[in-house]
Amino acid sequence: MEKEKVLEIFEKLEVINKGHFLLSSGKHSDTYLQCAKIFQYPNYSEIFSRELAEKFKGYRIDVVIGPAIGGIILAYEVARQIGVRALFAEREDNVMKLRRGFEISKGERVLVVEDVVTTGGSVKEVIELVRSLGGEVIGVGTIVDRSDGKIDFGVPFESIVKLQIKTYEKEECPLCKEGIPLVKPGSRKL
């Protein structure tokens, strides 16, 4: 999908928000991407998931997993496109875990998906979880890569769109210095 088409859909669905945001990574930004707006529409969920699944065509995948909350619907839809199981990892006591009877068997080939990647923190936690259970991570996929090319997961990393959006450490944030109120829209520590 062309970047212009993605941005057109994002604009239509009001995915891109402007302000002063605390991201789940702990960084600050003037832009927040609310991909949940995509997933409220099954047709858009299917379009983006099919696009992401297509990027991993030719890989043998047994399971698709995503971190809660942003990766739940994406993992399910990508898995549906591929025809495999879908799981999600949840944070419990600040650690990513499989719950609800979910399991990964030793040797299963796993694709990790997330709606937006900035620092890759949640994805790295899910990768560690999968490996600790004996699974083999074969790739990482995301709708939006806003990492500015600064992440290496050690496996193929694919995105539907790359966006260059500035992020700041709290101490260096110009929005804080201007006294603009900070909003925390993400799902970390729900």
Curated annotation (Swiss-Prot):
- Note the superkingdom of the native organism: Bacteria
The family database entries (CDD domains) matched by this protein are listed as: PRTases_typeI
Q: Where does 5-phospho-alpha-D-ribose 1-diphosphate bind?
A: E114, D115, V116, V117, T118, T119, G120, G121, S122
User: Could you provide one GO biological process annotation from this protein's UniProt record?
Assistant: pyrimidine nucleobase biosynthetic process
GO MF assignments? magnesium ion binding; orotate phosphoribosyltransferase activity
Q: Coiled coil: which residue ranges?
A: none
One family from Pfam that matches here is Pribosyltran
Q: Which reaction does it catalyse?
A: orotidine 5'-phosphate + diphosphate = orotate + 5-phospho-alpha-D-ribose 1-diphosphate
Keywords attached to this entry: Glycosyltransferase, Magnesium, Pyrimidine biosynthesis, Transferase
Against Gene3D superfamilies, the record matches this protein to: 3.40.50.2020
Question: NCBIfam families in the record, alphabetically?
Answer: pyrE_Therm
Q: What does this protein do?
A: Catalyzes the transfer of a ribosyl phosphate group from 5-phosphoribose 1-diphosphate to orotate, leading to the formation of orotidine monophosphate (OMP).
The UniProt entry's sequence similarity note says: Belongs to the purine/pyrimidine phosphoribosyltransferase family. PyrE subfamily.
Q: What is this protein called?
A: Orotate phosphoribosyltransferase
